[in-house]
C-alpha cells in the first residue's frame, strides 16, 4: 500500500521529491504528532501572490481550510493569517467559522512587532504555514521564476522565528519551512534558485502544497483515530469557492478551478486515495 507521503508526492512535476531523502520518511505523521502534542490554538498562514495575474493562487488557501476544519473537528481553536491579497477569499470561503487576520505588508521592524503582538494575543500552541512565500537570505521574497514579489507579500516569517512549534508545507523551495533544507533546494535545478531560509520544526512536502496539507490531515486522522479529512465533494467545494473569490491557478494564471495545472479531477483523485488509505487503516469519521 502507498503511504500518505507516496500519495502526496505523486505526479511531482517540480522536483520537490529531491528533498525526500532529507526529511523524515513519515514526514506527514511527524508533523501530525507535533500538532497532537500541542493542543490549543493553531495559527494557519497561507497566501501566495501571482505577479502576472495580480491575484493570489489556488495552491495554499484550500489546503489551509482543510487543515483548519480538520483541527477544529479535533477540538482546536483555529486562526487564519494572510495579507490583503488573500484575506478576502478566505473570508468568502469560511464565513465566520474562524478569525482571519490581515497581516500588514510593511517593514521588518513593524512586521516583527505585529507578529509578536499576534502571538501574544492568541497564544497559539502551533503555527502552520502552507504555500506561504518565505524570506530569502537577502531578506526578499521571490516567486518560482525568480521575480521579486516583496511588495506583495507580508513578512509573516516573524510568526515562525518567534515560535518553537511550527510546521511548513511547500512544493517549490521558496515557502516558509524550506529553510530546513535550503542548500538542497538551491542545488536542485528544477526548484527555486533563491530558496526561503525560514525554518520550521517540521516540514511537509507535496507535489502541490494543498496535497501536502491534505496528507497532513490524513496523518492527523490516522493518529487520532477520527477521520477529519475533507471528502472529495467538500474539497471541490472549497476550491470552487476560492476561485469564485478571484484566486487563480498558479500555472496558467487563469481564474479556473485548477491548482498548479492540476484539474479538479486530478485533485479529487489525491483526496480519494487518502480517503481510501484511511479506510484501509480502519479510520472512520
Regions found by a protein language model. Name each.
Residues 76-85:
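Short internal beta-strands
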Residues 176-285:
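C-terminal functional extensions of proteins
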Residues 57-75:
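Histidine-anchored nucleotide/phosphate-binding helix
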Residues 19-23, 46-62:
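Short, glycine-rich nucleotide/cofactor-binding loops
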Residues 94-118:
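A glycine-rich helix N-cap at a beta->alpha junction
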Residues 56-61, 126-127, 132-226:
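Conserved mixed alpha/beta catalytic, RNA-binding, or beta-rich assembly cores of soluble enzyme
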Residues 41, 125-126:
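Structural motif
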Residues 1-41:
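Positively charged, low-complexity intrinsically disordered leader regions
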Amino acid at each position: 500500500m502507498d503511504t500518505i507521503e507516496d500519495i502526496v508526492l505523486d505526479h511531482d512535476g517540480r522536483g520537490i521529491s529531491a528533498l525526500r531523502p532529507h526529511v523524515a520518511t513519515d514526514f506527514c505523521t511527524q508533523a501530525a504528532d507535533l500538532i497532537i502534542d500541542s493542543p490549543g490554538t493553531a495559527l494557519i498562514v497561507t497566501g501566495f501572490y501571482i505577479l502576472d495575474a495580480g491575484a493570489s493562487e489556488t495552491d495554499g488557501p484550500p489546503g489551509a481550510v482543510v487543515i483548519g476544519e480538520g483541527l477544529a473537528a479535533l477540538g482546536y481553536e483555529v486562526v487564519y493569517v494572510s495579507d490583503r491579497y488573500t484575506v478576502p477569499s478566505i473570508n468568502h470561503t469560511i464565513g465566520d467559522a474562524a478569525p482571519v487576520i490581515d497581516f500588514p505588508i510593511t517593514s521588518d521592524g513593524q512586521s516583527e512587532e505585529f507578529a509578536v503582538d499576534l502571538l501574544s494575543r492568541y497564544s497559539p500552541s502551533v503555527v502552520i504555514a502552507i504555500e506561504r512565500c518565505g524570506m530569502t537570505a537577502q531578506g526578499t521574497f521571490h516567486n518560482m521564476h525568480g521575480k521579486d514579489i516583496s511588495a506583495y507579500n507580508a513578512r509573516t516569517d516573524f510568526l515562525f522565528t518567534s515560535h518553537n512549534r511550527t510546521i511548513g508545507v511547500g512544493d517549490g523551495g521558496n515557502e516558509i519551512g524550506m529553510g530546513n533544507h535550503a542548500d538542497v533546494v538551491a542545488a536542485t535545478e528544477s526548484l527555486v534558485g533563491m530558496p526561503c531560509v525560514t525554518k520550521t520544526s517540521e516540514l511537509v512536502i507535496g507535489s502541490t502544497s494543498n496535497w501536502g496539507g491534505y496528507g497532513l490531515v490524513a496523518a492527523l486522522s490516522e493518529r487520532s483515530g477520527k477521520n477529519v479529512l475533507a471528502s472529495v465533494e467538500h474539497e471541490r467545494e472549497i476550491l470552487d469557492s476560492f476561485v469564485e473569490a478571484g484566486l487563480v491557478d498558479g500555472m496558467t494564471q487563469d481564474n479556473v478551478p485548477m491548482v498548479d495545472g492540476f484539474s479538479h479531477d486530478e485533485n479529487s483523485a489525491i483526496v480519494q486515495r487518502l480517503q481510501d488509505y484511511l479506510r484501509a487503516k480502519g479510520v472512520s469519521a
